A protein has these predicted regions:
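Phosphate-group recognition and catalysis centered on beta-loop-alpha active-site segments
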Residues: 1-325
Length: 325
């Protein structure tokens, strides 16, 4: 909700599933790092070792807990250098609760949910009728009225981008919805989780020509677009220009304000980083942990800083929106 207050156009979340098939918002497949699960004696025997993207991983896996059990936990801030005052105060929320936050906002706020780790989820969570994780994901969006291709009237009422690192998931749901999809691309040494394809294969001209039939854009890790050596951003790759040549949007991730994430080229100034990526690299959108700073940058650098045309347009779009039934 704070992101909405700070001006976010879209709010982003990763979607996983509980043991009993309820879709929830959570970043990791294990609960260890960002919840207090280790404090619960009744869950002490739940620790497991599963293969996750080719790596044996041990922890308290979200797929081994029912929604009721997940709701009994409280979440914590992952990074020790960030504000810790909210640790232990909030529950894990469901996908439906997340959607409601966006729909209840006083203006149009889009959502940007990720189909997260579908290989693992489909392996350990089973739904009636042979349905898959991806089916339940799309059903949830349809239930709340999300429909329509990019920039269509229906899409503008309730904007959404569907993202995933798993290309087979995006291809699978392309037969169920025309909502815009974004293919996420990991670091150069991490293959795709479902097809085991290398970074170089999925960023080749041949693959971009293939995937553009199913997605609106790509979402690469930003340090693969502009390689980094000794904390200096180097010469950009040509991936953005090759994507744009195929009418693919580019939405890199993740931009953060802390000094440890800002390369020396930007003099520890996040506004310089935004300026470089938006005006030099020419990205079409980006993921940030600091909505307020990006929103301020957009406001301060708008061609007509005092022109409220954009605000009026957003208000008109908001008037088109109706609550889901």
């Amino acid at each position: 909700m704070r992101a909405i207050e700070e001006g976010a156009d879209f709010i982003e979340t990763d979607i996983l599933s509980s043991k009993d098939g309820v879709l929830v918002c959570f970043h990791d497949v294990i609960l260890d790092d960002t919840t207090n699960v280790a404090n619960y004696k009744e869950f002490a025997d739940r620790k497991r070792t599963y293969e996750v993207q080719g790596v044996n991983t041990t922890g308290y896996f979200i797929v081994d807990f029912t929604l009721k059990e997940l709701k009994s936990l409280r979440v914590n801030q992952r990074f020790s250098f960030r504000d810790q005052q909210f640790n232990g105060k909030f529950q894990i929320i469901t996908f439906e609760e997340f959607i409601t936050i966006a729909l209840d906002a006083p203006r149009v706020v889009g959502i940007y949910p990720e189909i997260k780790n579908p290989v693992l989820i489909n392996q350990y969570v089973k739904w009636s009728g042979g349905k898959k994780f991806e089916d339940k994901f799309v059903e949830t969006l349809h239930k709340f009225g999300y429909k329509g291709s990019y920039l269509s009237k229906n899409w503008l009422k309730q904007p959404v981008f569907i993202q995933s690192f798993a290309p087979t998931s995006l291809l699978y749901i392309s037969n169920q919805t025309d909502l815009p999809k974004v293919f996420l691309i990991d670091d150069v040494d991490i293959p795709t989780q479902d097809t085991n394809q290398s970074y170089w294969e999925i960023t080749s001209d041949t693959y971009l020509d293939y995937i553009k039939q199913y997605v609106l854009g790509i979402g690469p890790w930003k340090d693969t677009l502009v390689p980094v050596i000794n904390n200096y951003a180097m010469t950009p790759s040509d991936l953005v220009s090759r994507a744009h040549a195929r009418n693919l949007q580019v939405h890199p991730y993740t931009y953060r304000n802390e000094n440890k994430y800002l390369h020396f080229n930007y003099s520890q100034d996040p506004y310089k980083e935004y300026d470089y990526w938006i005006n030099n690299i020419g990205v079409d959108g980006l993921f940030t942990d600091f909505t307020g700073s990006l929103h301020n940058f957009q406001e301060w650098t708008a061609p007509n800083h005092h022109d409220n045309t954009a605000s009026k347009l957003l208000h008109e779009i908001a008037l088109l929106a109706s609550p889901y039934e």
